[in-house]
Structures are given as structure tokens and as C-alpha cells.
Amino acid sequence: GKGGLRELTNFLAVHEHTISYLSSKLAQHFVSDTPSKSDISYIENAWRKGNGNLDQVHTAVIERAILSKEPKFQWPMTWLFQTIRLANATYFMGWDEVFDYDDKLMNHRQTYEELGQSFWLPRQPDGYSSDKNEWLSGEMFERRVRFADAIYRAGNPQVSSSVIMDRIGANSATRDLVKRAGKYENEKFIALMCSPELMGLENA
């Protein structure tokens, strides 16, 4: 009857299966590609204590992600935002540029489609895959290389690769990779942004 849908959603929101399933998905997406039972339990407990309060659930996810030492693969879109922010680059159209033509500023739709992760493209009902193996083809990696190059050339990055590495405490394998990439800053920038560490992969 009237109000039945609200009762159903309230029931499902605090159901144990819901808590367990969504906590595991959140842990896999934000904490680790293979989250531990303790990671999932931490989020589950926050869910129960807060009776499904999303602020508390999200806080628990962030806390666990900060504490985690496990590599977390970055989705193409997440990686792109990370690259732009680390370099303090200007790559997308902002509010003031929406109706202006500037061939150095990319349209969001074109960018996401090229990355293979567009809001507007048909996709599976359960969203994009959280399995990193789905995103690790040579083609998908080559796209990241091209985007890193485009951000360097057109995005006017304000932070050098060496400063970025110092800020994030880059490991020795990443520093060695960047050093071997070449003598020019654009080569170092691409190597850093497409390194295993910044893509959220274990270093070989």
C-alpha cells in the first residue's frame, strides 16, 4: 500500500546481505583490489552502528583507504583526475569556458569516451567493472600514455615530475623509472603518471 516502497527500501538498507555486499564493493573500489576481511568488517560495523547513515559509512571507507598499504588500481577516470590535480594542470573546460572555443581545453564527453569510461555510453546494469584486469590491455594503457602527453602539452602543468614524486613520497622503483625515461620533462611526466605506482599497480 501507500508507503510500502519506503518501508521496503528501509528494510533493504539495513539488511545483513545489503550491508555485506555493499561493504565489500566499497572496499574493493576504494581500499584494495583484494580487500581483507578486516577492511570489509570495518565498513560493515560502521554501517550497523550508524543504521546505514552514509556519512558514517563513507567516513569508514576513507579511514580504511588511508590506512591501507595495498595497491589500489585507479580507474581511467580516477587516474585522469589524479594526474590533473597532481600537476595542477588545466585540461577541462571550466564554467567560464563552456561557451568559448579553445582547442587546448577538452570537452568532458570526448575525454571520457576516449578513456573508455563515459557517463553517456551504454554499459552493464551493475556499472563499470571493478576488476583491474578489464582495464589492463595494451590499448587501454596506450590511451593513458596519450592522455598524459596531452595533459603535459596542452594542460600547462604547474608542478614538475620531481616535485610531484617528493610530495607523494614516490618509491625507488618509480624514481628509477622516471630517471630512465629520458632527459626531457615531458618524457619524465609521462613515465611518472603511467608508472605502476600512480596507476595503483604493484611495482614489477
What are the functions of these language-model segments?
Residues 1-15:
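Short, functional "switch" segments adjacent to catalytic/cofactor/reactive centers
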Residues 15, 19, 23-50, 55-204:
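Flexible, low-complexity segments enriched for small/polar residues
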